[in-house]
Swiss-Prot record:
All copies of domain Helicase ATP-binding, residue ranges: 197-375
One Pfam family cited in the UniProt record for this chain: DEAD
Any one GO CC term of the record: nucleolus
Organism: Mus musculus (Mouse)
Recorded name of the encoding gene: Ddx52
Motif (Q motif): 166-194
EC number: 3.6.4.13
Name used for this protein in its record: Probable ATP-dependent RNA helicase DDX52
BP terms from Gene Ontology: maturation of SSU-rRNA
Length: 598
């Protein structure tokens, strides 16, 4: 036994790298073996067809005598071999691989077990069943959702989209609509758009939650326009409800922008009396989509006959759904119920959108919506991570005004939004800041609609640096480039806090939020501090030790906020004098008008 044979036996099933260990290969004569003349003679002497006879000589040595080839005998042997049952291809490959390698004297030896496994792997790749393909597809979809923090609940879930071009490939989107989306600067869909658009295009009812500034308006606008396909004269076929007129105006503007050139008639109710004539029973019904607030729509529905027809509505979208479902004076639950009942079409589908999940909204949707799909982005009821959040202790109510003036002295980068608890406090803070030499204005429900529109327009144009507002304006309004949000009065809940600070840090931009708090705000601190901590911002250690409020206490605080001291620094004596002068002036004007009439 030479070194080559010994190496082969010891290294059976192993692989040897000749290039890397060339010196050892030369030493042990590892390589393709060159057969000598004796080996070749032995090979020639092999009897494959039984034509040779072995005869022993006197010494007992084996001698081989070759007979002349017999054609008939050879053909018979071949016929017998052809009649033998053929082995399966896989088994044949398994048995032939090691034999061939042994014969060639190659370097790579593979055991029959390894060859069998390799063969099975190859055949498995060729014969992927439909079940395996479906499993692989689901794995890819789940990986994509996890990557973008998309959480989905429901049955038979549609796959998300990765690009807007997929809408053309899979859903045949109107080419003009797709071009409008791209021209508006929306190159890649946001996570909520990736999942919400396919869900609505499949005609599924939806409950969606995503952080502020994540593109929820576009997430329901695109599927509405795609499913309506083209304008018709059947009346309104899509209805979008929002809690404030400012938000409704913003949605209306976005819908008009992306539907340009498609022919859709998109309307908004400005004055109910004019709308009754425009959309009433005698109208031409040349309209497709309506964007409105609940109260204006209820006014039209309560008329006899109704001032608007909603029987052909196919999509009912409720934006800021958790606010609209609230009970009490600030909520719209009763109005929303009337609107739902007015949409009697069997084709109607409903979609709820908000930045925060409310438990009662979720339960209502599960009970009343048909096969609803729940979509949420990131952690539920969490603040957007692009906002730097800070809690600032100011001691008392007077400390808030001092802290505000200190911020003005240090300098700030406008525009700035300042949130207060009530309309009265908004007026008081406005009168205090107007003398600080900054462009400041106030917006609240007691101002006329024209005044509110002018204020919002001036703030967007940069003419106003600081805008004081109440919590209702925190819902959905998209002010471009807001750099700072100041919570002058502490929010009554973590949900309200999330919506307030969501006015900055929108569409991936950075922002900052500063929240003032006093000793009186101690019961509310823990819930807001948890939101700040989840977003990765620092929170003082002593706040983490505060007790949590019970659910009953939280509801009570929301319905009846803390009574706070007046912001106004003017002495009461001068305020009373000013009121008396104002009343006297009004009385004198009345007397003059009476004299003129007489």
């Amino acid at each position: 036994m030479d070194s080559y044979d010994l190496f082969r036996r010891l290294g059976a099933g192993a692989k040897f790298d000749v290039k890397r260990f060339s010196a050892d290969a030369t030493r042990f004569q590892v390589g393709k073996r060159k057969f000598d003349s004796e080996s070749l003679e032995v090979l020639k002497g092999l009897d494959f067809f039984g034509n040779k006879k072995s005869v022993s000589d006197e010494c007992g040595a084996l001698q081989i005598h070759q007979e002349p080839p017999n054609e008939e005998k050879t053909q018979g042997v071949l016929l017998e071999r052809s009649k033998e049952p053929k082995k399966k291809k896989r088994k044949k490959m398994t048995s032939e691989v090691p034999a061939q390698e042994d014969f060639d004297g190659g370097i790579q030896w593979t055991s029959s077990v390894e060859a069998k496994l390799q063969d099975e792997k190859v055949s498995g790749e060729k014969k992927l069943t439909s079940g395996k393909l479906e499993h692989l597809r689901k794995e890819k979809v789940n990986f994509f959702r996890n990557k973008h923090k998309i959480h989905v609940q429901g049955t038979d879930l549609p796959d998300p989209i990765a690009t807007f071009q997929q809408l053309d490939q899979e859903y045949k989107i109107n080419s003009r609509l797709l071009q409008n989306i791209l021209d508006a600067g929306f190159q890649v869909p946001t996570p909520i758009q990736m999942q919400a658009i396919p869900v609505m295009l499949h005609g599924r009812e939806l409950l969606a939650s995503a952080p502020t500034g994540s593109g929820k308006t576009l997430a329901f606008s695109i599927p509405i326009l795609m499913q309506l396909k083209q304008p018709t004269n059947k009346g309104f076929r899509a209805l979008v409800i929002s809690p404030t007129r400012e938000l409704a105006s913003q949605i209306h503007r976005e819908l008009i922008k992306i539907s340009e050139g498609t022919g859709f008639r998109i309307h908004m109710i400005h004055k109910a009396a004019i709308a009754a004539k425009k959309f009433g029973p005698k109208s031409s019904k040349k309209f497709d989509i309506l964007v409105t607030t609940p109260n204006r729509l209820i006014y039209l529905l309560k008329q006899d006959p109704p001032g608007i027809d909603l029987t052909n509505v196919e999509w009912l979208v409720v934006d800021e759904s958790d606010k609209l479902f609230e009970d009490g004076k600030t909520g719209f639950r009763e109005q929303l119920a009337s609107i739902f009942l007015a949409c009697t079409s069997p084709k109607v589908r409903r979609a709820m959108f908000s930045a925060t999940f409310a438990y009662d909204v979720e339960q209502w949707c599960k009970l009343n919506l048909d096969n609803v799909v729940s979509v949420s982005i990131g952690a539920r009821n969490s603040a957007v991570e692009t906002v730097e959040q800070e809690l600032l202790f100011v001691g008392s109510e007077t400390g808030k005004l001092l802290a505000m003036r200190e911020l003005v002295k240090k300098g700030f980068k406008p525009p700035v939004l300042v949130f207060v608890q009530s309309i009265e406090r908004a007026k008081e803070l406005f009168h205090e800041l107007i003398y600080e030499g900054i462009n400041v204005d106030v917006i609240h429900a007691e101002r006329t609609q024209q005044q509110r529109d002018n204020t919002v327009h001036s703030f967007r144009a940069g003419k106003i640096w600081v805008l004081i507002c109440t919590a209702l304006l925190a819902r959905g309004i998209d002010f471009k480039g807001v750099n700072l949000v100041i919570n002058y009065d502490f929010p009554t809940s973590s949900v309200e806090y999330i919506h307030r600070i969501g006015r900055t840090g929108r569409a991936g931009n950075r922002g900052k939020a500063v929240t003032f708090f006093t000793e009186d705000d101690k019961p509310l601190l823990r819930s807001v501090a948890n939101v700040i901590q989840q977003a990765g911002c620092p929170v003082p250690e002593y706040i983490k030790g505060f007790q949590k409020l019970l659910s009953k206490q939280k509801k009570k605080m929301i319905k009846k906020p803390l009574e706070r001291e007046s912001i106004c620094t003017t002495p009461k004596y001068f305020l009373e004098q000013a009121k008396q002068k104002k009343v006297a002036g009004q009385n004198s004007k009345k007397k003059e008008t009476l004299k003129e009439k007489s």
